[in-house]
From Swiss-Prot:
Belongs to the UPF0736 family. The lineage of its organism: Bacteria, Bacillati, Bacillota, Bacilli, Bacillales. HAMAP family: UPF0736. It comes from the Bacteria. It comes from Geobacillus sp. (strain WCH70). This is UPF0736 protein GWCH70_0753.
Length: 246
């Protein structure tokens, strides 16, 4: 088995979509970075890599058995053994995983560029491990947006877009036709006469479809207005407004 040593990781917990597991250039000063003293490295199929990167579903049992207690984290000069922690690659993408004792990928991290390069060199001549791919059908929806809706966005923009979608989802629950017409008019004032004739579902669906792709000042302004007066959403908004990288 291949091993990496002295690996810096920045764990993103409970993320089912790989686009929320930030690459090194999007790490922030207040992220909690850890040092893995030793971690097993596995080359797997692209299908299995994508499955683990983009879900919180069960990891193949054989893979977990192969890496059991072979990783160590260094904390306060102590070397602590981890049950199921490993790095996987399909030769293209690279992902560190820690299940914190479970059988699903609870924590995920990218590696720093220098260590990514080392991974590519180490697995270049190796065959992928023949782990079975669990049956799985990934479904995207407003609270788990498709990667194509997040393409090209920075970490801050992705976070705000997900906040906008959460607010739109809550708006959908109100079934308030006057309110949804108001917000759709905020987004597209030139369509005001048509919007006034729309049903709740029509107006909401148009607003959702038109905000799905990209990110702009217009998106940001709508998000800020939609969440006003909702403490939980306002807190999430404020967290992204503090001076940070990305």
């Amino acid at each position: 088995m291949l091993y990496l040593h002295d690996v810096w990781v920045n764990w993103f917990e409970g993320e089912e979509n790989g686009y929320n597991v930030c690459h090194f250039h999007e790490w922030r000063k207040d992220d909690q970075v850890e040092l893995l003293d030793q971690v097993p490295l596995l080359k797997v199929s692209s299908a299995l890599f994508n499955y683990i990167e983009n879900s919180l579903s069960e990891i193949p049992k054989q893979l977990l058995e192969d890496v059991y207690q072979k990783a160590y984290v260094r904390k306060n000069h102590e070397r602590i053994q981890l049950d199921y922690c490993f790095v996987i690659t399909d030769g293209y993408g690279i992902l560190a995983v820690d299940t914190i004792g479970y059988n699903i990928p609870i924590r995920k991290s990218r590696l720093i560029p220098r260590q990514e390069q080392l991974v590519y060199e180490m697995v270049a001549e190796h065959q992928e491990e023949p782990y079975p791919l669990p049956a799985h059908e990934k479904e995207y929806h407003i609270l788990s947006p498709s990667p194509e809706w997040m393409m090209g966005l920075t970490r801050k923009e992705r976070q705000l877009k997900q906040l906008l979608f959460m607010a739109l989802d809550q708006l959908h629950l109100t079934k308030n036709v006057a309110e949804v017409r108001y917000w759709y008019t905020e987004w597209a004032p030139q369509k005001y006469p048509d919007i006034q004739k729309m049903s709740f579902e029509e107006a909401w669906q148009h607003l959702y479809e038109e905000t799905k792709y990209g990110w702009s000042d217009k998106h940001e302004q709508l998000c800020e207005k939609l969440i006003k007066g909702q403490p939980f959403f306002e807190k999430l908004w404020e967290m992204e407004q503090e001076p940070k990288v990305n």
